[in-house]
């Protein structure tokens, strides 16, 4: 199939040349890592693995490590909400999602600007959310989280986290409770010990991608998509890292090409502007192989832009079905 006849040969061929590209492989079931990992390592590649099949064996991935400005915080929050919304789900009332994202923005901005590095992670976001108790029968009650933001406001009334928190806090106690429940439903996976351990620190060193030969494998279950949101965040941050590195550090083009092998492409929620990135990445020495079952999957993903996505692909490889 697609993996055996295209993805694996790409990896094997790279091992024959000392100038082979770096790889980012979406790897359902871990087949690519199992069959090519040792060969890549022996050929001089550094191997990193985000293993959502066996999280206790995975390298850790903390998205907070790669935040460099307030815009990237906003992108992280937006992408998390998009990736944790079930495909095809139509919210009856978008108010709850938009206000829940305002609360999440307040919490992430607080950690990004105020917390020590070891506390900047999603498990700490969950701790803060749990500290924000709301009493529906008492609008005047101040939770430990309210006190935290009050102190920050006294110190810096114009703080971006304070602005977002006040926006969230403007509703009644009953409304605030519903907002918290909405946010908790998007963040529920971060209650699991396995994901807490995986996202507490970072061992992926995404900043090295494009600087030296690396192979990053994202192992995902092919029958359960509930953790795929983490790969969506990884994609968004990787594209951001690679584009910034090419533009601001290397005069527009990465010294080591980076090839994304996106097997089961349809299973991952992509960054909002993926089709725009696709048209501009080649000049930066970043390449993508979109691997799908059929064109119908592409049409479902990019209802209006699917022809543009197809047009931005140099080659179309069709395997007989």
State where each predicted segment sits.
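Conserved ATP-driven motor cores of ASCE-family P-loop NTPases powering translocation/secretion/packaging/pilus
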Residues: 278-321
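P-loop NTPase motor domains
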Residues: 1-286, 301, 305
């Amino acid at each position: 199939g697609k993996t055996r006849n295209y993805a694996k040969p790409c990896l094997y061929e790279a091992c024959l040349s000392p100038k082979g590209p770096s790889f980012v492989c979406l790897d359902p079931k871990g087949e690519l890592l199992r069959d090519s990992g040792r060969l890549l390592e022996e050929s001089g590649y550094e191997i990193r693995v985000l293993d959502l099949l066996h999280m206790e064996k995975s390298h850790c991935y903390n998205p907070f490590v790669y935040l460099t400005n307030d815009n990237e915080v906003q992108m992280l929050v937006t992408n998390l909400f998009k990736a944790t919304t079930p495909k095809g789900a139509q919210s009856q009332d978008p108010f709850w999602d938009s206000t829940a994202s305002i609360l999440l923005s307040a919490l992430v901005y607080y950690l990004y600007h105020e917390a020590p590095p070891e506390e900047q992670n999603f498990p700490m976001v969950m701790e803060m959310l749990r500290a924000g108790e709301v009493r529906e029968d008492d609008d005047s009650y101040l939770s430990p989280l309210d006190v935290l933001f009050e102190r920050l406001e006294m110190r810096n009334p114009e703080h971006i986290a304070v602005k977002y928190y006040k926006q969230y806090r403007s509703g009644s106690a009953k409304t605030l409770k519903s907002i918290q429940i909405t946010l908790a439903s998007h963040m529920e996976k971060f209650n699991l010990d396995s994901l807490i351990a995986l996202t507490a620190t970072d061992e992926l060193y995404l900043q090295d991608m494009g600087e030296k030969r690396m192979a990053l494998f994202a192992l995902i279950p092919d029958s359960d998509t509930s953790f795929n949101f983490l790969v969506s965040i990884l994609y968004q941050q990787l594209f951001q890292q690679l584009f910034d590195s090419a533009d601001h550090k290397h005069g527009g083009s990465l010294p080591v090409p980076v090839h994304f092998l996106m097997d089961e492409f349809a299973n991952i929620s992509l960054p909002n502007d993926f089709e725009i990135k696709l048209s501009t990445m080649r000049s930066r020495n970043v390449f993508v192989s979109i691997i799908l079952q059929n064109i119908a999957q592409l049409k479902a993903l990019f209802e209006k832009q699917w022809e543009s996505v197809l047009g931005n692909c140099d080659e179309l490889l069709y395997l007989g079905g």
